[in-house]
A protein has these predicted regions:
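Conserved N-terminal glycine-rich FAD pyrophosphate-binding loop of Rossmann-like flavoproteins
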Residues: 1-17
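Short hydrophobic core segments
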Residues: 115-125
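A conserved short coil-to-beta-strand element within the FAD-binding core of flavoproteins
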Residues: 100-115
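Active-site substrate-recognition segment that forms the wall
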Residues: 1-2, 34, 124-182
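Short acidic/polar capping segments at secondary-structure boundaries
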Residues: 79-82, 107-108, 125-128, 180
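Flavin (FAD/FMN) cofactor-binding and adjacent substrate-gating region
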Residues: 19-98
Length: 182
């Protein structure tokens, strides 16, 4: 999903999410990119205010009838699913095709190399906080399993810490959950 989860400040993350949504929607036209639009249902156990990102997704609607037990409301909308192994390979090919070069180095802080490169792409994951001297970056633990594809839409219950989700992909489905900070 393109909207930020457990992130802040909302003004910035919503703007990033909106721009990302628009770009990824365009990229769905290229089947090799590994991105598809999917109908998404996010379920809640209590009434919700309008989400700050509702105007940035397609076909947003609020559902209050015919919901699974224990749920009183659901947001329905279109968003993208990115199959990361496919997408990252596609991005790397584009990068190389545009003349980009990869250089593998061991870095303990970005300040060590900031003068050597005009652009540094930080995709270090859990090491981000350490490399960027940002003490507010922390890991969030999750668990997933992959199964044969059964449905074509995404289902979410993102109420921390009992997070649960079903994400369809081209050859499998991801079943996941848990959101334990630290």
């Amino acid at each position: 999903i393109n909207y930020p989860f457990l992130s802040a400040p909302v003004e910035k993350t919503d703007a990033w999410g909106s721009r990302t949504y628009d770009i990824l929607k365009l990229l769905t036209a290229d089947e090799k990119a590994g991105i598809q639009m999917v109908q998404t249902f996010e379920y809640f156990r209590s009434k919700q205010e309008d989400p700050s990102w509702m105007d940035t997704v397609d076909k947003f609607e609020r559902i209050t009838e015919n919901l699974p037990s224990d749920y009183v409301e659901c947001f329905s909308f279109m968003t993208q699913v990115i199959e990361m192994p496919i997408y990252l390979s596609w991005l790397m090919e584009r990068f190389k095709g545009l003349g980009g070069k990869m250089e593998k180095v061991i870095v303990t802080n970005f300040s060590e190399i900031s003068d050597d490169f005009s652009v540094i792409i930080n995709c270090t994951g859990l090491s981000s906080g350490e490399l960027c001297d940002d003490s507010e970056v922390y890991p969030v633990r999750g668990q997933i399993i992959r199964i044969k594809p059964l449905i074509g839409e995404m289902h979410l219950d993102q109420q921390v810490p009992t997070l649960a989700y079903i994400v369809p992909r081209s050859n499998d489905m991801i079943l996941g959950g848990v959101a334990q900070q630290g």
